[in-house]
Amino acid sequence: MTGEDFPEDLPKEDGCGWIWSMKSEPLIKRRVAGVDDPLFLDSLDIYRTSFPVHEQRRIQDFPLAFQDPGFCYEVFLNGEGRVVAMLVTWRREQFVYLEYFAVDASLRGQGAGQRILEELRDAFPHKVILEIDPPEDGISRRRLGFYQRHGFVPNPQFDYIHPPYTDEGEPFPLLLMTHGDLLDEETYRSFVDFHHRHVVAR
């Protein structure tokens, strides 16, 4: 927590289980209610341009995800009310899975992504699990370094393969990262089972 005051018209608890406050103006976080929410539609440009097609859930499959009580789709608005970042998480007792996290290109390098990640990390210490591309080129290595600077560690001990989001797709390898501690075998198995049963369900 930063100790800053919240505007009177904003709840301190965002419905996803963590308290929200930004250290600088003017980002405002909102939880998206579903695929018919205008904020969802406004976030699709960031979603589509930030992730390769094989890593994207089809738009028609999002309604099923929204039915899960632990699914949180959140967007961040600038002072003009424009969506400039998105964060998609799944909350479970053992872990919080960060599925999608992207910042509009206009804000990259200005610390917005860092602040958003720090708020999530601090709200769920030692529970956040995320995935990155294997660090095989400059971009992926910089992404690895970004998360390492914020307390996340890679888990190369697991040969993690992400299932396809569509019947026509192919599985693809990713590197799991966790906050603070390496994944133990039990948590890893629980995560993989959850991921197959819920995240890529269609």
Which residues does each PLM region occupy?
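Conserved GNAT acetyl-CoA-binding A-motif
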Residues: 124-138
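Conserved beta-strand in the GNAT
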Residues: 75, 81-90, 95-102
